[in-house]
Amino acid sequence: MITSSKKIVSAMLSTSLWIGVASAAYAETTNVEAEGYSTIGGTYQDGNPQPINIYSVNGVQAINFVNRGDFAEYDVSVSTAGEYSIEYLIGTSIASGSAVEISVLVDGNWQSAGSTNVPLGQWDNFQALAANNNISLAQGTNRIKITGAGTHDWQWNLDAFSLTLVTPENPDNPDNPDNPDDGNTGQPGTPFTIEMEAFDATGSDDPRAQGMVIGERGYPEDKHTVVDSNQTTDWVDYNINFPVSGNYRIEMLASGQTSHATAILFVDNVQINEVAVDTGNQAVFLDFELTDSTYISAGAHTIRVQSGSQINEFSWMWFGDALTFTPLDGGSTDGDADNDGVLDSVDTCPNTPAGAQVDANGCEIIVDNDTDNDGVDNSIDQCPNTPAGAQVDANGCEIVAVVDADNDGVEDSLDMCPNTPAGAPVNGQGCADSQLDADNDGVSDDIDQCPSTPAGSVVDGTGCIVVTPPADSDNDGVVDTLDMCPNTAAGLTVDSQGCALSQLDSDNDGVTDDIDQCANTPSGETANATGCSSSQEGGGTDPDTPQPGLLYGELAGAMNVSDTNPNWERTTDLLQTEDSVKGNTTEVYTGFIYDADGHISFYEHIDDSVRLYIDGVLVLSNDSWEASSQTTDLNLTPGTHEIELRIGNADGGSGAVDGIGFGIDVDGGTNFVHPSTLSESIFTSVGEETGNPDLEQEGDIIVELESFVFTSTNGRVGSDSVEGFSPTATGVNWVTNGDYGDYMVTFEEPGTYGAYITISAANDGSYGARVDVDGWPVAWGYFGGTGSWDVSSENLLYGGTFVVEQAGEKVVRVEAIGGSDWQWSGDRVRFTRLGDVTAIPSPIYNPDDHFVAEIQGPQTDVTYLKKPVEIPANKKVLKSDVWYTYPQNRELEGYDNFGATGAFWGHPPEHDFYDDTVIMDWAVDAVYAFQAEGYEYTARGEFDWGYGWFTEYTTNPQPHYVRTLDDRNVRMTFMGYLSHDGYNNNWLSNHSPAFVPFMKSQVDQILKANPDKLMFDTQTNSTRSTDMRDFGGDFSPYAMENFRVWLSKKYSTGELAALGINDINSFDYGDFLRAQGVTHTSWSNAGDTLSGNIPLQEDYIYFNRDVWNQKFAEVLDYIRQQQPDIEIGASTHLFESRGYVFNENLTFLSGELNLGARTTISELPTNILVHLKGAQAVDKTLVYFPYPWEFDELRLQDAPRFGRGWVAQAYAYGGLFSIPANVWVGGEVWTWSPGADNYRDIYLFVRAQADLLDDYTSYSKVGLVHAMYSSMKAGFIDGGNQIQSSTKLLTEGNINFDLLVFGDEGYPVVPRPEDFDKFDHIFFDGDEQYLTAEQQALLDQQGDKVRHIGQRGTVSGIEITVSISGTESNETVSAVSRIHETDAAAPYVVHLVNRPFAGGVTPTLNNVEVAIPQSYFPEVVTGATLHLPDGTSTSLTLSTNADGDVVLPVNNLEVWGILELAH
């Protein structure tokens, strides 16, 4: 029997032999894979169910079990009729009697071309074997039969065979067009077309214009690449070699909506004609006859088309697509042998060198005054060193091709505000302040003097809250906002809250304080007319006698289930369940409940946690604020039962969420009501009330908040015109987040203290306060509103350890914290002594335990990007991995069968991060449980969401925060207004000496859970504080100190002096800028795009990145020491170049990214592709998910299936897109599910095609130069306009490309020689201007491989052409080519991504053809299979078009398909 054995000659070697054959005179070769037969048959009985078998061997498929008389028939298409030679890739272990015969079916009869003996070799060692005879084939499809024709029972195994044209039927009349690169535009007598974007030069005769650029116009289904940004007098030139002399008609395909616009035609600087150009719509294209006839001689000529105006008005004009030249007569046969544009009959210098300028006699004109060969004389050339091949304007300066209709500096495809007023400065999305209203108060940002007005506020014309002077309606000396008793009678003495004794009842016994003789009547006891109860007059109640109501008290802890009820007081109505719960507090209700029939059920919907016990049995438990919970009918024994209810809150919001917080149905059903509404109380309890310890005690220290010695702010609330606290007669108001007051307070004795603050706040919100003593936080708390400015409440500041070790005067700071911008009006702070001095826990961070490395100097030498470290195959991120966004997503209904392999964002606990019990609970319950189900767990280290961890790590994080030029904290408002342990979510500075130890501490805690992979959300490291207009730089003391070191290593003393720095040891960059009048605002605006001439600003940007790279490298090295083989990811992207991490220990990229849904959902935008290309350039897989607003836009437009395109595009370009389960969209909606059924098939398709994804890499013949400095100036993290424009142009032309990355002056990386060698062509665009001189010289060494992107149309064989129903449709379907990284024999792959959407759904396409140039891949494509997400795989019939391209027919293409290509 035939068995497989190791192949000796590789398939790649065999194919290289075919290429040699294909380079013969006619070079038409058709390759046929043996397994691609149409039918098989045979006669020999070998026991095999089929006459012939298909098998796999050494990475290829072939046929075996071929016996004498067995045959396979093939349908083979050729474009030219004629004689073809035959070559087989064939092998046999039969010494003699093995032969192969080839026949062709002609008019129903088989005509044999003879047989060829197969020499002895090995079954699976396929060797090239030339047939003895040729075969005659007709143009089109031929039926060919290959037969086992020898005498032996066993014949041969066959891999493939090829047919090469030897003699065409009519070799004297070849129908192939001229090579488009040979200087001829077409054949004599035939029309030819020039694409107008392939201009040779452009410029303008008006100084207000700069010539035309390349852009796009048209409807989504009919896009045209055009010359764009065309203003009056702009022109484009084309150097054209006309094939014949004669009269030509010249037409222009164009659109335009300017009624007075014209197009002027010039031939060799002579005006021929002027015609009107107006189609009424930029998207409607028509042909305009520029001339019906003009004589042009054979040879080279310059054709110019210039825009004009019938009324001489300067304005936007037309958009030109193509020029068509039609010869009107047979043309002269007079030739032009030297191609100098002068016919041979009059050429007196017949051998002119190629490219030379000549006079009318054909003789060379010597020009020596154009040094850079850009066509502009040196005397007027303002840019004398223009790079070779660049397009230039009339001044000799390179043209940057960016489509920007409103001229605001933001390319149209990224412009969220397309009609910006002329000259207005804009942000990264193209919006001027006059087009924005950030706080939605109805006043545009350009005139809004209070840009952060709270929602719903009434504002004036400047956008600031309308404030009326404080009122005092009852004239008692206490303003209404603080007056707790607003109708005090005239003349009465009042307290600080505006209440007279006659208006107060402090013990709630029904007798006012002015006549109450027993001031502290116990709660629940009845008082007489003088305010005294029987127990106060000598009587009492038996504590063992059941009393109405439940005993109520409060305990420390988010859910304290171990400590007993402190029994502060009795509550009969349980209304406390409907109030807010203090932070880090558990409310406890204990006693008895009576139920007559035993049928009873309970309900809760409380933020955060609830536990309900009946007779000691837990019957209700819930830790979710989002979802309510309830019991069924408990079917108790009729009578009295013990009850215990515990309600806990960790932090932030609390209390009833929606409707009632705690409910009961005494009939055991679902008609729940609050207990306070029951006609009879069913609760009793036994025991004495201990009293509320939070009540004021004798000897307490009272701090009146209006008595501060200093006030200021750490925050930034734009609508607050008061810096710090605003004092009133009895308190403070105008308090916003970060405002603080300092007080001198004397503590008479040491001890442990508690702290309370009395505030009022009319609205619901997130309010809080922190108390510092001598610069150290001792107490903090969070609380809700009081419902009115007239109602105040005292709140316990429950957090911290408040210990005074020595008596005496202390500096006490009271600071407003919490989530809301506008905070509270404050009355006082009260300190009560609780006991003796207790031990103070030491902070986790001790600076003495850590070495801080000296800051390194700048990187100045040209260097290479570091390749990521090798990760073992079993631990790598795979291109076919399918990850949940969060591990818990797998538990959602419908999402358990997506073929998932792991999870993206495995969040460690948000609080108590350094409590090993909490960490190990996370390890067991989250990490190990997930891994036990066969998934990989990626644990996430944090920056922004780690703000709470950092507070726990340092206890006092304030010295380590980023500080702006005006000395404010930078709050990370993009993640929400959050606060933890007394500190808001402020930005941690990378410059802090605590930064590296903190990050290492994260690593230590996370690795205790043994996750499979690590990912750090590094995009919010503090380099971003220098990256966006909203934040404004890091001028913290630690940053200033590090900048001094960095500058001293970059500059000499003399150079520093020239910069205005005379003493580097005392230099403070913040003081330096402030002394020159630079403000926070001017710095921020300039820093956003590196404009505005701020001294040392670029140095400062580079310095921040250098320090960030140095410090994070320490962390990455620390990880590698502990886990050498672990994958480490980070949300660092090449196009956020200010914070990019140049480190080999990072092995994949991750994060949230912008996908452009708000721009359009009619087609897949290309802006994300720069990130995928960037990841490819640094050899790291990109794993990502969109920003919340992207899916929210799909929700608003009811287009959940649009995201399928995002997923398909990610995997097609080598990335991973995590499963969109319940996605966070923010706002009042919180989360939204786009539907499991809309995405399941896409992800199962990924897993099914793992062999075509894993270990595959991008394949292209074009490299695109990318200068990282362009991203520095972009103002957003998606790169600059030019790279976005170039990416769009190449993608929608189906020109696959990869990036050649050039760094900036701060980190001047360059491509390696092997990076350049990968590409046949290198394109550059306007961003070339950002290369350093050294980088430009390196690029220039690549010679004529380098050309401007505008010349892409002159290069053949670089694109895969997609057509639909015969119409080229590259902008509709992207054809993304990829090859295996290491296995040259593996199939090639082309991903087909269908880009348009209609109503959020991808239209299914039929009659699609994909044309792949024969020379595109390293080897010729010989077979194809189409794989679709519906589970089908279809073998495709290959054909060849007139250009020799392999053409593949594709049908039923929805959003994505994969072409598997044999070769």
Curated annotation (Swiss-Prot):
Residues making up the propeptide: 28-684
Gene3D superfamilies tied to this protein: Galactose-binding domain-like (2.60.120.260), Glycosidases (3.20.20.80), TSP type-3 repeat (4.10.1080.10)
Domain PA14: start-end pairs: 534-677
Gene it is expressed from: agaA33
Catalytic activity: Endohydrolysis of 1,3-alpha-L-galactosidic linkages in agarose, yielding agarotetraose as the major product
Highest taxon of source: Bacteria
Names of required cofactors: Ca(2+)
GO MF terms held by the record: alpha-agarase activity; calcium ion binding; carbohydrate binding
Signal peptide: 1-27
Top EC category: hydrolase
Domain CBM6: 701-832
Temperature dependence: Optimum temperature is 45 degrees Celsius. Stable up to 40 degrees Celsius.
Lineage: Bacteria, Pseudomonadati, Pseudomonadota, Gammaproteobacteria, Alteromonadales
A Pfam match: TSP_3
Quaternary structure and partners: Monomer.
Keywords carried by this UniProt record: Calcium, Carbohydrate metabolism, Glycosidase, Hydrolase, Metal-binding, Polysaccharide degradation, Signal
Stored InterPro entries: CBM6, Cellulose-bd_IV, Galactose-bd-like_sf, PA14/GLEYA, Thrombospondin_3-like_rpt, TSP_type-3_rpt
Activity sensitivity to pH: Optimum pH is 8.5. Active between pH 4.5 and 9.5, stable between pH 6.5 and 10.5.
Protein name stated in the entry: Alpha-agarase
Biased composition (Polar residues): 518-536
Annotated EC: 3.2.1.158
Region of interest (Disordered), ranges: 166-191, 512-549
